[in-house]
Amino acid sequence: MEQPERSTIAREADRIQQATASDARRRALAAACVGNLVEWYDFALYGAFATLLAAEFFPGADPAGGLLATFAVFGVAFLARPAGALLFAHYGDRLGRRWALAVTLLLMAVVTAGIGLLPGYDSVGWLAPALLVLLRAGQGVGLGGEYGGSAALVVEYAPADRRGWYGGWQWATVALGLAAGIATAALLSATLEGPALRAWGWRLAFLLALPLGLVGLYIRLRIEETPGFQAVQRLGAAARTPLADTLRAARREVVVGFGIVAMISATFNIFYVFLPSQLAITGRAPLTRALAAALVGLLVAAGAAPIAGRLSDRVGRRPLLVAGVIALLLLTVPLTALLQRGEPGGLLLGYILIGLALGTLVPSTFLAELFPTRLRYSGLSLTYGLASALFGGTAPALATFLVRRTGADLAPAWYATGLTVVAIACVVLAPETAGRPLDAGGELASGPRG
């Protein structure tokens, strides 16, 4: 069947958008953000408890080897993300965002709570790490479908002149979810004696995921489908093969998004997963001190994101992207050197500056605006799922390997800097997306603007 013009979809979506009450928009924003926060809380726990999980599931290895094995399992979730991204994007672009996002949240909550119930290596031998791998893969499938769907939902509900503001809150809840996971780990580490924390304390944080997930699920089930997807449905324009259509019609957008997400994901995981554990096992800083500084950095990123998003509504997406990427290019190596010293003031300053740079990027709105509504869930999920799997999930294990092989503490920082150079090239190729209707054209073929 012949598809309607993108401008026709844009006009229909705009008509539905104008009829959408402001409280419905607020509910949709809350549904996306609360669920997103819960899912990233779930995901952050594994990295925050990496040293304890290494002892629980890989007790025979030396501390560095056990940490490497734990980070390898950490990467399993990222490798599973493309499967979740493709699965949920297929149904999200065919049937709607709402139900796909409800299932991703429920899956994430159940498998995270399952990690809290796992027996240790001393009880069941190698079955314990095998089950850990299985549940981490389940986390990856759930989170693989979350980011693209929540970004699509937020941007499609937002008024055209406030998409950056809405997307900024979606990006902020990524940082807030990670911060909540780290804060929970830090609180338990500070309040429980060592034996109690190792025996059962860490499990409480994982079990908390289930009631939190059910709250988020309740909120998500109370919203309507987005105005943009309602327009696609009414016009009979829903894609039958969203993935194939995305690869055929939006290859350049996928490449640009891939390069940007690869840099962000790797940088996030090097600074917020690898470095705190590395500082702890090398004795340069207690884990609680490193986690506290990382927590402050995430809160700074969360605070910066909505402000940067609102600013991008006024000056455009590309200026904010350029500012954030150049800041990371200049700061990653020197701030890693500062953090590696383990001094309280240096840790705090380093994580604040990294948080500001990452918070400024606000990629959610920009990436969502690159793709047409009928392919948005697939485009976002494909870009995010593949980039985070290949570069984000492997970053902690690769960073650990690089330090062990080269003896250079800054090797992971140089790796992240190399990815930042690639991201700069992608930003240069990207069009300005602010202010235009979501389906009004302006693809990459028209070249950068703004």
Question: What residue ranges belong to the model's regions?
Answer:
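Helix-to-loop junctions at the C-terminal end of transmembrane segments
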Residues: 85-97, 305-317
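Multi-pass alpha-helical transporter architecture, strongest
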Residues: 216-223, 366, 418-444
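Glycine-rich segments within core transmembrane alpha-helices of 12-TM secondary carriers
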Residues: 165-189, 212, 383-395
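Extracytoplasmic gate region of multi-pass secondary transporters
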Residues: 47, 251-300, 392-396
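C-terminal transmembrane helical hairpin of 12-TM major facilitator-type secondary transporters
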Residues: 318-363
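C-terminal ends and interior cores of transmembrane alpha-helices
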Residues: 106-124, 326-341
